[in-house]
Design a protein with these regions (language model features):
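A mobile "lid/hinge" subdomain adjacent to the ATP/sugar-phosphate binding pocket shared
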Residues: 176-206
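Extreme N-terminal starter segment of soluble prokaryotic enzymes
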Residues: 1-5
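Phosphate/ATP-binding catalytic cores across multiple sugar-kinase/actin-like superfamilies
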Residues: 212-235
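Short glycine-rich phosphate-binding loop at a beta-alpha junction
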Residues: 54-68, 232-240, 317
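Short acidic-aromatic active-site loops that bind/stabilize oxyanions
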Residues: 89, 204-220, 409, 413
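N-terminal phosphate-binding loop and adjacent alpha-helix
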Residues: 29-55
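Phosphate- and other anionic-substrate recognition elements at nucleic-acid/protein interfaces
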Residues: 42, 46, 61-86
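Flexible beta->alpha loop and helix N-cap segments adjacent to enzyme active/binding sites
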Residues: 6-38, 76-87, 91-99, 104-178, ...
Length: 470
């Protein structure tokens, strides 16, 4: 048996990936243990390998929470006399793992990390790789800048979620372009201080404008970073900041981007595995690769019943196959709803999701019909914002007229494609509101128990329909 292992040992969203005689395996600790953004212990990695029947990998590569100095790990849990996992091992820095995680042969690679690489004393937020050069981009991580705004509003929960929440709020404000061009790592804290003293809320219009201004500053920083690339050649992108759909959409207007769904730290293990193997490899059924419980494929009868319930206005859970890679629901771990229901966003939020009032919901659309409803017709991983081209889709239309949508083809997700097609047959609309199968503060579901979310009318596990949710 030949075994290669990659460990994404980070401060949050830890994971492990392996090639075992060519068979790909992936497990994320938050899904496995039910703790959002979980940071795994070394023993969890060892237990996972035991579950997979692995005792001693032929080659193991790991990231050491960004704490690499001169190519050497600060701590040595996977090598030396005290190693908890025996085998040939190497430690790589955070950015290097992100870079390899794209599994792309693109000539240009961009790593844009939210907080900077600890492997370089926390000073660098970006890594640019072109055929001619490698450039460390020195700037305070834009994710950290947006996190400060979450502290101003006294957000609860984990700060790794703050930038995503701010991304939704910025649409309610109007940026001051002159100020945005001046905001940097030296003055951001001073600019936030008056708002902290004032004690603002998310509905304060002046603060919404400030949020929009800081977000615009982050966009300008990232546009400057990308200006070093050749816009005519593909850029493979990674790093948690690349989950920002607003900025991604601006970049897309000028550059050819490949952004995989696992750009965040949950993809580090895949990058570490790529480094261990030394070459790209195929991942079957990508991105539906979570090591979790998977029910049987739904029948045509089940698809018809689910589509009918959605057409009638019910909110349903949709748990099919293995879970998707990354933080976005892509049709296997989803809460679904008819996107034409009046006040649908508020109904869903009050009954089920219980998120901040300003945060929008995404949508999924049949790939071949996308251009009729959105101005971006290819978005398989929900990583761009598109302008909504028709009226009457209020539950999925943000205040700025955009929607973060997923395009679904039969090849990408057959079961979900069939459901969307059947819903279109019943309603004339090939779109469903799609949000992740979880509630605030919890990870996306990985088994029956975690999927039984209060407030759903019903949930489908393959062909099994459950109606007693709470």
């Amino acid at each position: 048996m030949t075994v290669f292992v990659g460990i994404g040992d980070a401060a949050h969203d830890t994971s492990i990936a392996a090639l075992i005689d060519g068979e790909f395996k992936y497990r994320k600790s938050e899904r496995n243990l039910g703790v959002k953004h979980h940071e795994a212990s070394e023993n969890w990695y060892k237990q996972t390998l035991n579950d997979w029947g692995v005792d001693k990998p032929d080659r193991l590569c790991y990231t050491d929470k960004g704490k690499v100095r001169g190519g050497k790990s600060v701590r040595k849990p996977y090598n030396g006399e005290d190693a908890i996992i025996e085998g040939d091992s190497v430690c790589i820095d955070h950015h290097t793992a992100h870079l390899h995680s794209t599994l792309s042969n693109a000539e240009q690679h961009a790593v844009f990390d939210g907080r900077g690489s600890g492997g370089n004393n926390g000073r660098y937020t970006g890594l640019i790789v072109t055929p001619d050069e490698k450039i460390r981009y020195k700037h305070l991580g834009v994710g950290k800048m947006l996190t400060y705004l979450g502290h101003v509003l006294d957000f609860k929960g984990l700060k790794v979620d703050f930038p995503g929440k701010i991304m939704g709020l910025q649409a309610y404000g109007t940026p001051d372009l002159e100020l945005a061009s001046q905001i940097n790592q030296d003055n951001i804290l001073d600019l936030c201080e008056p708002w902290i003293k004032k004690g603002v809320t998310s509905k304060d219009k002046d603060f919404q404008n400030f949020v929009a201004t800081v977000h615009k500053a982050c966009e300008l920083i990232q546009l400057d970073y990308f200006s070093k690339f050749d816009p005519d050649k593909l850029i493979a992108c990674s790093g948690g900041v690349m989950l920002n759909t607003v900025i991604n959409t601006e970049l897309r207007k000028k550059y050819k981007l490949y952004i995989p769904p696992h750009v965040y730290d949950g993809g580090l293990s895949i990058g570490a595995l790529r480094y261990a193997v030394g070459k790209d490899f195929e991942i079957p059924n990508f991105p539906y690769i979570q090591d979790d419980w998977a029910p049987e494929e739904p029948s045509d009868q089940t698809i018809d019943e689910a589509a009918e319930l959605l057409a009638q206005g019910h909110i349903i859970g949709w748990y099919q196959g293995h879970g998707e890679l990354g933080p976005r629901a892509l049709g296997n771990r989803s809460i679904l709803m008819n996107p034409t229901i009046p006040n649908g966003k508020d109904i869903l939020n009050e009954r089920v999701k219980k998120r901040e009032w300003w945060r929008p919901f995404g949508a999924s659309v049949l790939h071949e019909a996308a251009s009729k409803y959105f101005d971006i017709d290819d978005s398989p991983y929900m990583l761009y914002n598109s302008n909504v081209l028709v009226n009457g889709l209020d539950p999925i239309t943000h205040v700025d007229g955009t929607c973060r949508h997923q395009t679904v083809s039969e090849a990408s997700n057959s079961s979900f494609y069939r459901l969307l097609s059947k819903f279109e047959e019943k309603t004339g609309l090939p779109i469903l509101l799609n949000t992740s199968l979880n509630v605030g503060g919890k990870p996306i579901a990985s088994d029956k128990n975690s999927a039984m979310v209060d407030g759903l009318d019903c949930i489908f596990f393959g062909n099994e329909k459950c109606t007693k949710i709470s």
